[in-house]
Structure formats: structure tokens, C-alpha cells
Design a protein with these regions (language model features):
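Alpha-helical residues within the helix-turn-helix
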Residues: 33, 50-51
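Key DNA-contact positions within bacterial/archaeal DNA-binding proteins
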Residues: 40
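Short, hydrophobic-biased segments on the C-terminal half of alpha helices
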Residues: 46-47
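C-terminal regulatory/oligomerization modules of transcriptional regulators
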Residues: 94-142
Length: 142
């Protein structure tokens, strides 16, 4: 599993919007400047997020984008699924993948299934609201 630039940018945009006034629309130009993403590329990502119902877009004066729900209701997993589709580490576990003829006897399949579950659980446990909390440095023990 490699998360694409599109997926990473979508996360950044959603975090950015979650930190704005929930009643106001944030112009594309402002988001692009803060996130250092080209307006053209960002527009494609925003269109996808509007289509998925994650954000609302309003054209014209006073227009822009805003979240459709509160930050607590968005998980990183849901945002990545909207932009990436499957987050599976191997093709046989992707959404709508044909059943592998070796699935019943594959010695590594349980490993990939567990990894898939760990990724889903971890990304599903983090919401946009979590980015509003102070960051605590992580100590790595040797």
C-alpha cells in the first residue's frame, strides 16, 4: 500500500478545513496557499471530496469549501478510502478483487489480512478533531 499524493493532499485539505470556522466557506486560493498545493490540482481533489459528500462547495463571492460534518465524524480511513479506494497491502485483499484460487492454502494471506486490519483500525481511530490537540513528541526507546 502506497498512499498517493492525491490521498496525502486530501488529508491535508480536510485537516485544514477542520481548523476553519465551520459556518464559513474557505476559498480555494487560501487553502492552496496554506497547503502549498497548486490551485488546479487542489480543485480536482476538492471536487472529489464534494462528490463523496465530505465537503460542501459554494461558488461566487463569499464562496469556497467547508466540511459537511463536525471534525469528530471524519476518520483518516474514511478520507483515504474516498480518495484512494482500497488501502490493502496486497491485491487479493483489495475491494472487489476476484477470489484467489490459492486463498485457502496461501501461507501468507493471514499476515496480509492482519496487516490490513491493523491499518484500518489505526487509521479509523484517528479523526480530524485529533489534529486540534497539542502534539506530544514521541520518545523512542533503544
Amino acid at each position: 500500500m502506497i498512499i498517493s499524493t492525491r490521498g496525502r493532499y486530501a488529508l491535508r485539505v480536510m485537516i485544514d478545513l477542520s481548523q476553519q470556522d465551520p459556518e464559513s466557506y474557505t476559498p480555494l486560493k487560501e487553502i492552496a496557499a496554506r497547503q502549498e498545493i497548486s490551485e488546479k490540482y487542489l480543485e480536482n481533489i476538492l471536487k472529489a471530496l464534494v462528490t463523496q459528500g465530505f465537503i460542501l462547495g459554494l461558488r461566487g463571492k463569499g464562496g469556497g469549501y467547508r466540511l459537511t460534518k463536525s471534525p469528530e465524524e471524519y476518520t483518516l480511513a474514511s478520507i483515504l478510502h474516498a480518495t484512494e479506494g482500497s488501502l490493502a497491502a496486497v491485491a487479493c485483499l483489495e475491494d472487489h478483487a476476484p477470489e484467489c484460487a490459492r486463498a485457502g492454502q496461501c501461507p501468507t494471506r493471514p499476515i496480509w489480512e492482519k496487516l490490513d486490519n491493523l491499518i484500518e483500525d489505526y487509521l479509523g481511530s484517528i479523526t480530524l478533531a485529533d489534529f486540534h490537540k497539542p502534539i506530544i513528541p514521541c520518545k523512542i526507546e533503544k
